[in-house]
Amino acid sequence: MVMSSYMVNSKYVDPKFPPCEEYLQGGYLGEQGTDYYGGGAQGADFQPPGLYPRPDFGEQPFGGGGPGTRSALPARGHGQEPGGPGGHYAAPGEPCPAPPAPPPAPLPGARACSQSDPKQPPPGTALKQPAVVYPWMKKVHVNSVNPNYTGGEPKRSRTAYTRQQVLELEKEFHFNRYLTRRRRIEIAHTLCLSERQIKIWFQNRRMKWKKDHKLPNTKGRSSSSSSSSSCSSSTAPSQHLQPMAKDHHTDLTTL
């Protein structure tokens, strides 16, 4: 039995075996010739018992001129490359496998960005947060002006009537300055307005009509009439007292 090159070229510490002479005396080992690394002294292909797997690089000659060739070793357990600690070294004529390429170094700009903002989410996952609408955005904030403000609805905006709506309302006001409830509902449905809007428009239009025709206000006339009646009632007793005073004066002169 020929000693394999695995035991000779291994980097492990040699175990405590008996000297080589004892093996020679016992007939375990034959004489080693010049074709030690070749396959000339071996009758068939020999595969050493490899402890670590060897990747399949194709059938390559193991020796430098022997007829025998070595096939790939079957994979076992660990996955270290040959030639490492405890691995099988290549023969002088066998090409060495190329070492794996190192990973590409990251760009300095990208690394600086990643270190400066570690909490930044990936570009593909953008978070969409719903907009928060607070109560003070919905209502008029006047608590600082009026402390008794309870947060009611803001003042209603003015109604913008269209040209067609104003034309129809003016036509109706030309014939009837006062509307009945039934007629007001009909106009509201026709012009797509509310009954309250029709009522307010007619009130404002009547005030404008009175101002254009210079008619006295009914409230002003009632107040002026009441004041004139009170003045007349106060002056009447004084006029009645004057003749009585004159009669009394004549009576005194006659005496």
Curated annotation (Swiss-Prot):
Coiled coil: none annotated. PROSITE patterns: ANTENNAPEDIA, HOMEOBOX_1, HOMEOBOX_2. Disulfide bonds: none annotated. A motif (Antp-type hexapeptide) lies at residues 133-138. One of its GO terms (biological process) is positive regulation of transcription by RNA polymerase II. Residues 222-234 have a biased composition (Low complexity). GO terms for molecular function: DNA-binding transcription factor activity, RNA polymerase II-specific; RNA polymerase II cis-regulatory region sequence-specific DNA binding. It is found in: Nucleus. Residues 94-107 have a biased composition (Pro residues). CDD domains: homeodomain. Residues 28-128, 212-255 are annotated as: Disordered. Signal peptide: none annotated. It comes from the Eukaryota. Sequence-specific transcription factor which is part of a developmental regulatory system that provides cells with specific positional identities on the anterior-posterior axis. Belongs to the Antp homeobox family. Deformed subfamily. This is Homeobox protein Hox-D4.
